[in-house]
Each structure stands twice: as structure tokens, then as C-alpha cells.
């Protein structure tokens, strides 16, 4: 057996252990060697396959993590978050699914009792009609809001302007096919041109513009990422000005959420003065609604605990301070301090202080119809917490949806059954009344002539 010295020791020992067996011939020895080689090869192959699988999983994990990081960077710094819900997407889960759900929702809305003595639907104030980022130089937008058809355009000088949509010549819609010429808007029908003051300054085939031909213009301000126009039923110049908050100089835009709400405009900001609703509607965790469905899990999953106070000023603003704590069992895991400033009927600014830095939210409420509001929240933050700011766009939207669900099916109650805790609601309604005036279009007239007054 001199040749055994050439085999690995494991094989040599195995072969030696077989010497006691009756079959000790060369054939049996060869078979044992083959089986041991096969077993070693199988083990080595299994190890190789296992290591390959682990390596493959690790590569996939790293690729996923890298892609996730790139996505977060992209949505935080390059392409802001945009979260939008149409009117029919929130608050209608009680209507069965099916191809006719849209019709059922329309029927439910039409049969809803709206209440009596509703305030005028279009109060006086500044209202956002377009997003700054969507109105490029030379572009034109068709806007229907405040019972008006509007043409919003950005001149070649970079300034945004707003005029009535219809040309005084033969009624063509300037926002549909109209062209920007310098600071002017040109009618698509006969090429009549109107300057920034609304005056017709030129038309083809004539060296002299017609006298006394003009189109209505609207006062415009750009701030908080939107284009705002001044609406006043008495035709007065703006009663107050709005400017950029100083914080925006160091903050970047992280995105916005947008909702259509079936309610009177007054009910949206009234929510702030309704302090008790915060813990009634917004205590359930954003992470899961299991605590709402199974109260025994409420403390384990966590809940939001709210404290707030609302005060009015002597002018067009009101102020609210909110503290929100997220509690799991008896432990406070996070706290947010919010300063809320209401500026007129359709503009709110929220400054948030958190453990991960400050944030700024600009809310606009714009009446698209007597009982249809467009509500937008634009979120800003410093660069270092941009990913959290992008996440906040959705978190704030999820909270706001809880209110929208209620608004989309409630009625307006002009004389509520007030209790002691509703004191701020009564005060709010008195304060908000300053935005209605003698010639404010009544709710009934707005329904009869929704886009012409």
C-alpha cells in the first residue's frame, strides 16, 4: 500500500479504517476513495452555492439601499414631493366600489343638506390662484376661482399678472390660445394686445389703438411659492400687504400636498379655532390606524397629544400656538411646537420647531366655487433636514385627510349648539366676519350665477 502516501490524510485514514472489513481488495478501496471525493466535492459545492446566495443577497441589499438613498436625495433636493387628492378620493369610503361610484358620489353631494344662512362664498382678501413654479416666463394659465374666469400669465420681464379671461372685443378667452408679448397679453382671435394696465395698445391693421377699450386687471403678489390676487367686493385696493417671511431666505422648497374640499371656505380656517377637535380627530397615530380600530392597542402603537390656544388680533390676522407630543405608553418620544398665523380668509403660515430642526408650511385656501375649495400646503425646510421635510409633506397630508373626510359630508351650521369649550369658535366667527362686506356676493346668488357677477 505504498501508493497511499499520495492521498490526503483524511482519505488515507478512511481507507485504513476499512482494512478490518472482509472486502479489502483494490476495488473496495477505489470505491471508498470515490465516495469520499464525492462527499468532499458535494460539501465544497454547497459551501460555494451558499456563499454565492449570500453574496447575491448582499449585493441586492446594497443596490436597494443605494437606490433608496438616491430616491430620497432626488425627492428632497431635486424633484419636490407632490401629493394630490381629488374631491372624490377622500371621505367616500362608505359608498360601495363599482363603475358607478363617481355617479353615486355626485348624487350624495347633490342631496346633501347644505344648511341655512350660509355666509357669502367669496370673502375679501388675498387668494392663491397658481403655483409660482408652474408659471414660466411667457406661459399662460386658465384659472377658474372666486366666481371668475381668469387669465394668469408671466410677462417676458418675469412678472406675473392676472386679467379677466375674456377679450372685450368679441369675447375670446385670452387664457386659451393667448400669447405673451413683452408685458402684454395678445388675444388669439384678432390679435388685440393688452398691456399690464389692461389697456388695449395695438391691433392689426390699425396704427391707433381704440380708445377706452380695456380689460380688468387684478393686483398680484408672489410669495410662499404661489401667485396671489386681491379680491374685494367693493373694488378697494388691498387692505393689507403680504411679503415673504424672513425664514424663507434659508429654507428650500420640499413639496406640496393638494386637496379639493367640499365645504364653505370659512369652515377650513375655523378648524384652527376648534381646539377640542385636535384630540378628537388627530390623536390616532400616523403610523397605523390600529389604535383607532382596537383601543387596547392605542397606548402601545402611540398617540398624538395636542394642546393649543387660539387668539384673534384687532386686524386681519389671528394667532394659534400648538404643542404636539407623540406618546407611547407613558413616554414622550417626540414634540413639535407650532406657531400658526392666519392672514386674512385664505392664507395661513405655520412655523414648526422640532428635534430635527425647523420647518415652514404655507397654506392657501382658494374658493373654486361656493362650496368647493382648493387647499394647498407648501413645505419648506433648511437643506440639512430636507429628507424630513419631504416626508413631512405626506405626514401633514395624512393628518389633513382626517379633516377632509368630515368636511366632505358635513353641513354648515350657522347657529351651533355652543358649549363652554366652543368659546373660540364663536370668537373666530365674529372675527372672520370682517372679510365680508356690503356687496359681497350672497351664497344664493353665487349658486345661480356661479361664474358671472
UniProtKB/Swiss-Prot annotation:
Domain Rieske residue range list: 126-229
InterPro entries the record matches: Cholesterol_7-desaturase, KshA-like_C, Rieske_2Fe-2S, Rieske_2Fe-2S_sf
Names of the cofactor(s): [2Fe-2S] cluster
Enzyme class name: oxidoreductase
TM stretches of this protein: 53-73
UniProt-annotated binding residues for [2Fe-2S] cluster: 167, 169, 187, 190
Keyword annotations from UniProtKB, A to Z: 2Fe-2S, Cholesterol metabolism, Iron, Iron-sulfur, Lipid metabolism, Membrane, Metal-binding, Oxidoreductase, Steroid metabolism, Sterol metabolism, Transmembrane, Transmembrane helix
GO molecular-function term, one example from the UniProt record: 2 iron, 2 sulfur cluster binding
Keyword tRNA processing carried by entry: no
Pathway it works in: Steroid hormone biosynthesis; dafachronic acid biosynthesis
Pfam family, one: Rieske
Annotated GO biological process: cholesterol metabolic process
EC number per UniProt: 1.14.19.21
Membrane topology: Single-pass membrane protein
An annotated GO cellular component: cytoplasm
Location (main, coarse): membrane
Subcellular location(s) of the protein: Membrane
Note on how the cofactor is bound: Binds 1 [2Fe-2S] cluster per subunit.
Catalytic reaction annotation: cholesterol + NADPH + O2 + H(+) = 7-dehydrocholesterol + NADP(+) + 2 H2O; cholesterol + NADH + O2 + H(+) = 7-dehydrocholesterol + NAD(+) + 2 H2O
Function: Catalyzes the production of 7-dehydrocholesterol (7-DHC or cholesta-5,7-dien-3beta-ol) by inserting a double bond (desaturating) at the C7-C8 single bond of cholesterol. Essential regulator of steroid biosynthesis as this reaction is the first step in the synthesis of the steroid hormone Delta(7)-dafachronic acid.
Family recorded in the similarity comment: Belongs to the cholesterol 7-desaturase family.
Name of this protein: Cholesterol 7-desaturase nvd
Amino acid at each position: 500500500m505504498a501508493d497511499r502516501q499520495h492521498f490526503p490524510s483524511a482519505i488515507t485514514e478512511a481507507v485504513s479504517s476499512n482494512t478490518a472489513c472482509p472486502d479489502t481488495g483494490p476495488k473496495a478501496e477505489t470505491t471508498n476513495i470515490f465516495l469520499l471525493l464525492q462527499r468532499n466535492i458535494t460539501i465544497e459545492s454547497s459551501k460555494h452555492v451558499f456563499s454565492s446566495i449570500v453574496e447575491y443577497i448582499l449585493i441586492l441589499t446594497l443596490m436597494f439601499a443605494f437606490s433608496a438613498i438616491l430616491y430620497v436625495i432626488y425627492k428632497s433636493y431635486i424633484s419636490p414631493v407632490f401629493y394630490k387628492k381629488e374631491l372624490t378620493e377622500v371621505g367616500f369610503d362608505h359608498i360601495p366600489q363599482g363603475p358607478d361610484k363617481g355617479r353615486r358620489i355626485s348624487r350624495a353631494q347633490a342631496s346633501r343638506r347644505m344648511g341655512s344662512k350660509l355666509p357669502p362664498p367669496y370673502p375679501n382678501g388675498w387668494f392663491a390662484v397658481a403655483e409660482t413654479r408652474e408659471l414660466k416666463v411667457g406661459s399662460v394659465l386658465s384659472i377658474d376661482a372666486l366666481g371668475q374666469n381668469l387669465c394668469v400669465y408671466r410677462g417676458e420681464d418675469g412678472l406675473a399678472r392676472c386679467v379677466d379671461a375674456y377679450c372685450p372685443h368679441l369675447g375670446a378667452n385670452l387664457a386659451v390660445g393667448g400669447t405673451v408679448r413683452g408685458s402684454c397679453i395678445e388675444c388669439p382671435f384678432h390679435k388685440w394686445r393688452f398691456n399690464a394696465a389692461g389697456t388695449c395698445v395695438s391691433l392689426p391693421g390699425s396704427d391707433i389703438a381704440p380708445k377706452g377699450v380695456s380689460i380688468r386687471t387684478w393686483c398680484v403678489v408672489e410669495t410662499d411659492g404661489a401667485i396671489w390676487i386681491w379680491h374685494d367686493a367693493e373694488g378697494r385696493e388691498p387692505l393689507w400687504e403680504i411679503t415673504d417671511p424672513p425664514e424663507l431666505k434659508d429654507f428650500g422648497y420640499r413639496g406640496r400636498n393638494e386637496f379639493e374640499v367640499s365645504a364653505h371656505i370659512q369652515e377650513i380656517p375655523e378648524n384652527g379655532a376648534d381646539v377640542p377637535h385636535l384630540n378628537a380627530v388627530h390623536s390616532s397615530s400616523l403610523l397605523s390606524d390600529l389604535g383607532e380600530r382596537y383601543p387596547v392597542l392605542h397606548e402601545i402603537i402611540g398617540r398624538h397629544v395636542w394642546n393649543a390656544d387660539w387668539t384673534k388680533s384687532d386686524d386681519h390676522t389671528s394667532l394659534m400656538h400648538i404643542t404636539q407630543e407623540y406618546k407611547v405608553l407613558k413616554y414622550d418620544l417626540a414634540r413639535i411646537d407650532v406657531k400658526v398665523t392666519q392672514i386674512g380668509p385664505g392664507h395661513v403660515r405655520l412655523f414648526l420647531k422640532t428635534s430635527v430642526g425647523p420647518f415652514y408650511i404655507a397654506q392657501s385656501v382658494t374658493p373654486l366655487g361656493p362650496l368647493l375649495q382648493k387647499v394647498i400646503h407648501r413645505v419648506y425646510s433648511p437643506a440639512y433636514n430636507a429628507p424630513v421635510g419631504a416626508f413631512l409633506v405626506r405626514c401633514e397630508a395624512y393628518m389633513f385627510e382626517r379633516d377632509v373626510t368630515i368636511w366632505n359630508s358635513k353641513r354648515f351650521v350657522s347657529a351651533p349648539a355652543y358649549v363652554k369649550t366652543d368659546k373660540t369658535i364663536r370668537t373666530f366667527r365674529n372675527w372672520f366676519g370682517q372679510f365680508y362686506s356690503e356687496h359681497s356676493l350672497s351664497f344664493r346668488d353665487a349658486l345661480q350665477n356661479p361664474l358671472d357677477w
